[in-house]
């Protein structure tokens, strides 16, 4: 009970900014990424499927919408592999077991990962109408989500899958109160258990993701796929200034383990993705984190407890 109350307080504090693009501003990630299922995994997508969860606070009782930016695969943003031949399907789920089903919180599209009740779906191929534009799912009634006591809110899920072709789809989401504009829901948040995304084509830009460290976490295993030796992944927290983790090569996974410090419990890590020089362009990567029990850890787009800042003393090395 104490754990649930603590998480709830942190959720309230963290979502006061109300900004709900996915990826969020603090993450500085250009696009989510999903390839068609005929693509080579060396393009950076390990399983051609990505799930995100939206948390609607219990106080909110009005219709809402899930908007998708550039939902088609074709045009300026998406990644071409020969000719555009890719079809992607977006599916929105609510109802019982949409989040509480264990398979829904796993990192691979296996078992009952499409748990819950299908509320809406739409397939997109190359379509200039939606290139650099928005498609809106909804309206949805908050009561259609799964109520989760720990969050004091209702959960919805959206899955994007590449069901045909071999091109890369770059896209974003926005949780909105308006079908035609991006208007945030106060107190809402979004999270995922695996992040598949496009890195910036600019080595001055640093991307971030923020896994939350729950009570009882002793150690974490950080896994990344197809990093392509594109610089460094650095972990920042309230108790550590920066710890580099192992990075993967092309079409490979790399794992690294990190012992959790007492001060880090109930806060978020800041995983910083620092690009290499010379510039590696169009790099797509996949990241997930598990605790010592093998359970997946959530990445909140609005970090729980806020963006972590190192609280210790900064060491200065004098210049001779």
Where are these regions (language model features)?
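Extracellular beta-rich ligand/substrate-recognition surface
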Residues: 38-49, 195-201
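Beta-sandwich interaction modules
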Residues: 111, 115-152, 257-280
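Acidic Ser/Thr/Pro-rich low-complexity disordered segments
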Residues: 97-121, 243-260
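N-terminal signal peptide c-region/cleavage motif recognized by signal peptidases
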Residues: 12-16
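Sec-dependent signal peptide recognition
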Residues: 2-10
């Amino acid at each position: 009970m104490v754990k649930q109350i603590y998480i709830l307080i942190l959720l309230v504090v963290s979502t006061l900014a109300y900004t709900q693009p996915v990826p969020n501003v603090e993450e500085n990630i250009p696009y989510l990424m999903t390839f068609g299922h005929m693509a080579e995994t060396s393009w950076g997508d390990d399983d051609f499927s990505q799930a995100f969860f939206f948390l609607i606070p219990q106080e909110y009782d009005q219709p809402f919408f899930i908007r998708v930016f550039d939902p088609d695969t074709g045009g300026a943003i998406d990644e071409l592999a020969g000719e555009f031949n890719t079809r992607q399907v977006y599916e929105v789920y609510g109802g019982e077991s949409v989040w509480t089903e264990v398979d829904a919180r796993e990192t691979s599209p296996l078992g009952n990962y499409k748990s819950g009740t299908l509320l809406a779906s739409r397939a997109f191929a190359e379509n200039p109408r939606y290139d650099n534009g928005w498609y809106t799912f909804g309206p949805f009634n908050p009561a259609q989500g799964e109520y989760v006591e720990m969050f004091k809110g209702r959960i919805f899920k959206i899955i994007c899958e590449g069901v045909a072709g071999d091109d890369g789809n770059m896209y974003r989401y926005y949780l909105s109160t308006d079908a035609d504009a991006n208007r945030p829901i106060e107190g809402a948040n979004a999270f995922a258990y695996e992040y598949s995304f496009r890195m910036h084509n600019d080595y001055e830009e640093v991307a971030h993701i923020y896994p939350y460290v729950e009570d009882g976490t002793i150690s974490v295993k950080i896994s990344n796929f197809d990093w392509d030796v594109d610089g460094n992944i650095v972990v920042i927290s309230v108790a550590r200034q920066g710890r580099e983790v192992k990075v993967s090569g092309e079409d490979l996974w790399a794992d690294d383990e990190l012992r959790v410090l007492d001060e880090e419990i109930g806060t978020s890590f800041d995983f910083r993705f620092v690009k290499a020089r010379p510039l590696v362009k169009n790099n797509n990567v996949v990241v997930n984190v598990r605790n010592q029990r093998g359970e997946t850890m959530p990445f909140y787009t609005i970090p729980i407890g806020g963006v972590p800042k190192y609280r210790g003393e900064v060491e200065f090395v004098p210049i001779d």
